[in-house]
Amino acid sequence: MGRTLEDKKQIVAGLQENLSDTVMTIVIDYQGLTVAEITELRNKLRPAGAQCKITKNTLMRRAIKGDEKWEPLSDWLSDSSAFLLIKDDLGGAIKAYQAFQKATKKTELRGGVMDGQPLSKEDIKAIGDLPSQEVLVAQIAGAINSVTAKVAVGINEVPASLARALQAHSDSDKAA
């Protein structure tokens, strides 16, 4: 027994709701994955604020129809498609997928969309190579901290060097 029209409308509405909260969507070919492997992929993506949705291409096509932000996805809707919907940590989610793909060697990255722009495999890999948001924040904080430390040392050095100069002058007067 197939899905009713009402079921399909609910699925499309759910996909549209998920896409509204999504920053980036990646399309992969999941053919050959077992249910356990798909569950493993979902578990790896969850900490990065991403989810893996598997649905018929026709339903996804209806969900993105008329939405300029996601219409470029239609270029990759063929065969067995799984959709990685990334909401938060782009780099972390891509790295989680890449680790899964490296371990299973069963999926193929087709492409993705971010802010209405289609992304090639190379673009997605480049985003995955970027440091995570936490690492970038730590690097910026470290740079700011080192600047303030150098300024503090510089400010303290002026009176210290003056005191050393006065001490040296005083010592030279005592010696003479």
Swiss-Prot record:
One GO biological process term: translation
Gene Ontology cellular component?
Answer: large ribosomal subunit
In Gene Ontology terms, what is one molecular function of this protein? structural constituent of ribosome
UniProt KW Zinc-finger keyword: no
- Keyword Transferase applies: no
Describe its assembly: Part of the ribosomal stalk of the 50S ribosomal subunit. The N-terminus interacts with L11 and the large rRNA to form the base of the stalk. The C-terminus forms an elongated spine to which L12 dimers bind in a sequential fashion forming a multimeric L10(L12)X complex.
The text of the family note is: Belongs to the universal ribosomal protein uL10 family.
Relate the protein's function as given in its record. Answer: Forms part of the ribosomal stalk, playing a central role in the interaction of the ribosome with GTP-bound translation factors.
Write down what this protein is called: Large ribosomal subunit protein uL10
Q: Write the gene name.
A: rplJ
